[in-house]
Each structure stands twice: as structure tokens, then as C-alpha cells.
Amino acid sequence: MSVNIALELARRGKKVVVFDADFGLANVEVMLGIRPQYNLLDLIHNNKSMTEIITQGPEGIGFISGGSGVSELATLDNASIKLLISELVKLDQMYDVVIIDTGAGITDSVMEFVMMSPEVVLVVTPEPTSITDSYSLLKVL
């Protein structure tokens, strides 16, 4: 969903970046068919800036890989999440639209990203588990 929205916004002239915040299970790179040179570990451990780890995709969109299959990203501590948020805020001045694609659930990182966002789009499917999980997230907002 986030990739399709990003591509359509780019076609309409917006400068868009997608931040794949489904840590360790990131799939934006899979959807785009692009293997990024960098992922969030490079920001956290290798002193790369957020802008340095952006990979260019089709239609001019940028994306930041959450690291597909990188188990260390699945268990980020609060300090790492705060670092990501402080770097993410800088992108707001470089892009018209910053899309944060989080994983399902009510983890600390999901809540941090939801609370910092001026607008939230909650994707729900007609499956009972999706409806229940989405309602649970809405209740804690």
C-alpha cells in the first residue's frame, strides 16, 4: 500500500520518501525490486545519515530500507528508535511527503511513529484479525 501511494503521489509531482519501519521484516525493497546498498543499521551503527541511506526508486521516489531479514533491527532499543525519529524529522524539510510504513501491532516503535505523525492511515482488511488489531490500535491512540 505505501509503495503504491508513494508512486502515485510522485506521478502527481510530489517529492516522496518511504521509510520502511517494519524493522527486520521490511518489504518496500521487495515491492520495488531494488536491493538497497544501505539499511537502518548503517544509520545506527555506521554513522551514516538518514539522507545517505536513501535509495532511489522508480518515479523518483526515495526509500529507506528497514532491513529485510535483519534480526537486529527487529529488537531496537529506545535509544535507537529516538535516533531514527530525530533523523526522520529532518526529511520533512527535504520531501513533500514522508510515508512511514510500520509493521502490524502496538509495539513501542509503532506507537512512537504514529504519535509523531501529523496524519495516520490505518490499512484494514476484511479479516477478523485485521479488524480486531486495527480497533485495538485505534483505542490506544
Annotated model-derived regions:
Residues 2, 77-80, 130, 134:
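Short, conserved glycine- and acidic-residue-centered signature motifs
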Residues 14, 95-96:
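Short, high-confidence coil segments that cap the C-terminus of an alpha-helix
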Residues 18-93:
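P-loop/Walker-type NTP enzyme "switch/lid" segment
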Residues 97, 102-141:
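Conserved catalytic-core segment of NTP-binding enzymes
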